[in-house]
Design a protein with these regions (language model features):
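Short, glycine/acidic-enriched loop or turn micro-motifs at the edges of active sites
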Residues: 73-75, 159, 213
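Conserved beta-strand segments of the P-loop GTPase G domain that flank and frequently precede/overlap
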Residues: 38-40, 69, 122-123, 155-156, ...
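Aromatic pocket-lining residues of Rossmann-like dinucleotide-binding sites
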Residues: 59
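C-terminal lobe/tail of nucleotide-utilizing enzymes
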Residues: 1-33, 188-224
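Hydrophobic positions on the alpha1 helix immediately C-terminal to the Walker A/P-loop
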Residues: 50-51, 55
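Inter-motif core of Ras-like GTPase G domains
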Residues: 145-151, 160-183
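Short phosphate-binding/catalytic loops that engage adenosine nucleotides
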Residues: 64, 151, 202
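P-loop/Walker-type NTP enzyme "switch/lid" segment
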Residues: 2-17, 21, 25-28, 32, ...
């Protein structure tokens, strides 16, 4: 298996560690049939990739085998934000888009990361109109293969409220986590996203709040 190094991965603080440990534990309550998990959001820049990457790391550190698929084929930021380095030292390499386009085989896009227990399928290159690639049978076949290799498959998808790609991705997944910026998304927007995902037959596992002032939030909760 090819090797992939993640060179920019800041450590979580205490509150962050506790939050991701809790989320990892809660995933186990979803049942053994829930293995392929899509992570999405209502808008761009709500932290879905942050959620995906840190959930991958937390699960792996707990000895759970996990695969991450970067499926944001339009404008992924994982390569640059997390400093992915491929075997030859390059900043880019073969990934999901290359496999779905039939340019390489499945084994060419599955990488062992430098985090034990964590494998990854990077995005490859941006695609202007990826819907045709996501609707072919190769995408579901890749997720099924990864589900045999790992305990969980985390799929970092585009925002539901921006493009239709995530709804197509959801059809191949067992459940969805929605990243939500605290006080930045309206109730109606969240309900619309919930409806779009549920129409695909993929259940909502829950929402994860980002950008929360933890001390202030817990203080208000305690004194109410």
């Amino acid at each position: 298996m090819k090797q992939l190094k993640i060179t920019k991965f800041p450590a979580l603080d205490y509150a962050g560690n506790e939050a991701f440990n809790t989320l990892s534990t809660n995933l186990s309550f979803a049942g053994a049939s829930v293995k392929k998990i899509m992570v999405t959001s209502c808008h761009a820049a709500e932290g879905k990739s942050y959620l995906s990457m840190n959930l991958m790391r937390t699960l792996a550190q707990r000895g759970i085998k996990v695969a991450l698929v970067d499926a944001d084929l339009r404008r992924s930021m994982v390569n640059s934000d997390y400093g992915l380095k491929y075997e030859d030292g390059r900043n880019d390499g073969k990934g999901l888009s290359h496999f779905l386009a039939g340019m390489v085989g499945m084994d060419e896009v599955i990488y062992q990361t430098d985090i034990p227990n964590a494998i990854m399928v990077p995005v490859g290159r941006d695609v202007p109109n990826p819907l045709a690639l996501l609707t072919n049978s190769h995408f579901a076949e890749l997720l099924d293969m990864l589900a045999r290799m790992a305990d969980y498959v985390i799929v970092d998808a585009p925002p539901v409220g921006v493009v239709i790609d995530a709804a197509e991705i959801a059809k191949a997944c067992d459940g969805t986590l929605i990243a939500v910026n605290y006080n930045d998304v309206s109730r109606q927007e969240l309900l619309d996203v919930k409806q779009q995902i549920e129409q695909t037959g993929c259940p909502i596992l829950g929402t994860v709040l980002n950008q929360v002032d933890y001390d202030n939030y817990m203080g208000r909760k305690y004194y109410k």
